Every structure is written in structure tokens, then in C-alpha cells.
Amino acid sequence: MKVGIIGAMEQEVTILKEAMTNCQTVSKAGCTFFSGQINGVDVVLLQSGIGKVAAAVGTTILLDEYQPDVVINTGSAGGFDSSLNLGDVVISTEVRHHDTDVTAFGYEMGQMAGQPAAFKADEKLMDLAEKALAQMENTHAVRGLICTGDAFVCTAERQEFIRKHFPSVIAVEMEASAIAQTCHQFNTPFVVVRAISDVADKESPMSFEEFLPLAAKSSSEMVCKMLELTK
């Protein structure tokens, strides 16, 4: 099995890159691809850049040129579920765009014309994430809907909009729906496994920038454990 792993920022892929053996690096279209092995599993690690367009470009190249069997999207996310705290993990059951609106033509909020309203994560990959979680100490995870948009959600108005239209949302971020849509079009199974770097409506002693390395550590450890369990 070959596993594609996607993170947007350098901080989100550094730990995974350092865990890789026989690493080869290729840069293309503003993306960086690291191919090698982690825990004995063939992987291609993509640092895509931030946002949906960058994620879609990188994922397309990843799927077309490297042809992984499955894709895992890792990194950080903003928590919307009240049980989440900094460093907790979210596992996608489905992913939706929160900044897409063609409802005037009869589509659901968040649904792009010609696409499903939600992109369903792969059941086997979700179960693999749960098994990895069971082997990690002191790690809390929530499984559910993750929503994506090309905006850092930091205002009460935007939070209220997302909660109104996507009431079951557990977390938001800026790449997953583009990755999920691209995987859907390539018929490649995917799952999103991210760690919480900030939580809506909760005060934090640390800023997003300060907590990002810790969130990256948590999500990377989860991905490494998933890879270990694939053997």
C-alpha cells in the first residue's frame, strides 16, 4: 500500500518528514512532495500550501503522478464541538465547503454544482484512525463533520453562520474539502485527521501561532500510529 499524506504548512509536515526514511524531494507548481517510507510503509508526503486552490492543485498532482491507494489529510483545525480542547484530535466522517453558495439553483448550502453536498470519508480509514487513537495515551478525539473555507474563522458572525448552516460541524479549517473533492473525482479513499489548535467560544492562554507546533505534533503522532497499524 502507498499512502498519500497532505499538510498545508511546513509546521504540519515537519515531524512526518523527519520520520521518513529514503526520502526524496520534488517541487512542482508551488508544492513540495517527499517520498519514502514511514514505519515501513511507502508514503508520499505533500506540503501543499494554504487554502483550497493550493490543496486541490497539490492533491491532483499527488493522485495523478504518485497514485497513492489512500489519502490522509493532517494538520491543525479550529474546534467547534464543545467537548474539544487544544491538542484534541478530530476525525472526519464527512467534509463540506462552508464558503460555497449556489443555493439559488437548488443546491444545499456548501454544495458545489455537480458535486455531492458532502464528501464521505472512507470507513476503513476512519476505523484505522480509531484503532490508532486507542493506542495513544491521553488523547481525546471526536468524529464528525469538518467544514472548509478560504478564511480563518475568527469572528462571531462567521461562527454563527457556520453553526446555522452546518449544525453538526465539529471543526473548521482551510484545505480538507478541496482535498476531499479531488479524491472524490479520482475515486481515492480519504480521511481527515487533524489536531485542534484553537476552539471557538473558548479562551486560550496561547495564540494559534503558539499552539500550532503542538497541534502538528499531536496530528503527526496519530498519522504515524495509523501507518504502523497498516502493516
Swiss-Prot record:
<feature type="binding site">
    <location>
        <begin position="174"/>
        <end position="175"/>
    </location>
    <ligand>
        <name>substrate</name>
    </ligand>
</feature>
<dbReference type="GO" id="GO:0019509">
    <property type="term" value="P:L-methionine salvage from methylthioadenosine"/>
</dbReference>
<keyword id="KW-0486">Methionine biosynthesis</keyword>
<comment type="function">
    <text>Catalyzes the irreversible cleavage of the glycosidic bond in both 5'-methylthioadenosine (MTA) and S-adenosylhomocysteine (SAH/AdoHcy) to adenine and the corresponding thioribose, 5'-methylthioribose and S-ribosylhomocysteine, respectively. Also cleaves 5'-deoxyadenosine, a toxic by-product of radical S-adenosylmethionine (SAM) enzymes, into 5-deoxyribose and adenine.</text>
</comment>
<feature type="binding site">
    <location>
        <position position="78"/>
    </location>
    <ligand>
        <name>substrate</name>
    </ligand>
</feature>
<dbReference type="InterPro" id="IPR000845">
    <property type="entry name" value="Nucleoside_phosphorylase_d"/>
</dbReference>
<comment type="pathway">
    <text>Amino-acid biosynthesis; L-methionine biosynthesis via salvage pathway; S-methyl-5-thio-alpha-D-ribose 1-phosphate from S-methyl-5'-thioadenosine (hydrolase route): step 1/2.</text>
</comment>
<dbReference type="GO" id="GO:0005829">
    <property type="term" value="C:cytosol"/>
</dbReference>
<dbReference type="Pfam" id="PF01048">
    <property type="entry name" value="PNP_UDP_1"/>
</dbReference>
<dbReference type="InterPro" id="IPR010049">
    <property type="entry name" value="MTA_SAH_Nsdase"/>
</dbReference>
<dbReference type="GO" id="GO:0008930">
    <property type="term" value="F:methylthioadenosine nucleosidase activity"/>
</dbReference>
<feature type="binding site">
    <location>
        <position position="153"/>
    </location>
    <ligand>
        <name>substrate</name>
    </ligand>
</feature>
<dbReference type="GO" id="GO:0019284">
    <property type="term" value="P:L-methionine salvage from S-adenosylmethionine"/>
</dbReference>
<keyword id="KW-0378">Hydrolase</keyword>
<protein>
    <recommendedName>
        <fullName>5'-methylthioadenosine/S-adenosylhomocysteine nucleosidase</fullName>
        <ecNumber>3.2.2.9</ecNumber>
    </recommendedName>
</protein>
<dbReference type="GO" id="GO:0009164">
    <property type="term" value="P:nucleoside catabolic process"/>
</dbReference>
<keyword id="KW-0028">Amino-acid biosynthesis</keyword>
<dbReference type="GO" id="GO:0008782">
    <property type="term" value="F:adenosylhomocysteine nucleosidase activity"/>
</dbReference>
<feature type="active site" description="Proton donor">
    <location>
        <position position="198"/>
    </location>
</feature>
<dbReference type="InterPro" id="IPR035994">
    <property type="entry name" value="Nucleoside_phosphorylase_sf"/>
</dbReference>
<comment type="similarity">
    <text>Belongs to the PNP/UDP phosphorylase family. MtnN subfamily.</text>
</comment>
<feature type="active site" description="Proton acceptor">
    <location>
        <position position="12"/>
    </location>
</feature>
